[in-house]
Amino acid sequence: ITSLLVSAYPAAFPVMMAEMASDNAMDNGPLFSVEFQSQEDAYLWQDIVTDTDEDAPQGLWDACYLAIASANHALQAIETMGNPSSLAPQRGEALICRAYGHFILANTFCEAYNYETASKKLGIPYAINPETEVSPDYIRGTLEETFSKIAADIQEGLPLIDDNLYSVPKYHFNKKAGYAFATRFYLYY
């Protein structure tokens, strides 16, 4: 389970996409070229449909759901073993990882959370079970439902995290990292 959780962290982030679409980017003229078409598309506020690299929307979407799938497989394995208390820290980490992946997706692909309108805005599909079929149909749900599920995973997972689980906790959700993520999430919620 512990080894499986290494893959429960997304291998892509929305940083480049967001930066290129912000006022932090500028056109340096014809002598400067971008590495990926998705960067130029984001800069020009065009739909990004050509690239599937990790900095493009499809790459981010796939990386986050791949990480979420790993977290769900870990959670299912723990449940299959009878939810032993010895695996509580791994369960906590898996729940936080699942929440984190969904948060990145919701924060990137949904409208900003507003408690007055969240019940009317589209959220993202919230995957809570390991996949048993290829390309299943998910119900997208509302933004309110998405954020509520993220909050539930955080609230259940945080108390279970144990900093003594790893000899090098820097690359896992330890207590401090878990609470830092929770703090960031609740700034939006």
Give the positions of each predicted feature.
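Acidic, glycine-rich segments characteristic of secretory precursors and extracytoplasmic regions
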Residues: I1-A25
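Active-site substrate-recognition loop segments, prototypically the cytochrome P450 B′-helix/B-C loop
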Residues: A25-Q39
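Conserved, well-structured interaction surfaces
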Residues: Q37-F109, G141, E156-Y166
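Well-ordered alpha-helical segments within folded domains of soluble proteins
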Residues: A67-L75, Y126-A127, G178-R184
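Extended, well-ordered alpha-helical segments in internal regulatory regions
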Residues: G101-A112, Y126, A182-Y189
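Short coil/linker segments at helix-helix boundaries
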Residues: T108-K149
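Aromatic- and glycine-enriched pocket-lining scaffold segments that form the walls
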Residues: I161-Y189
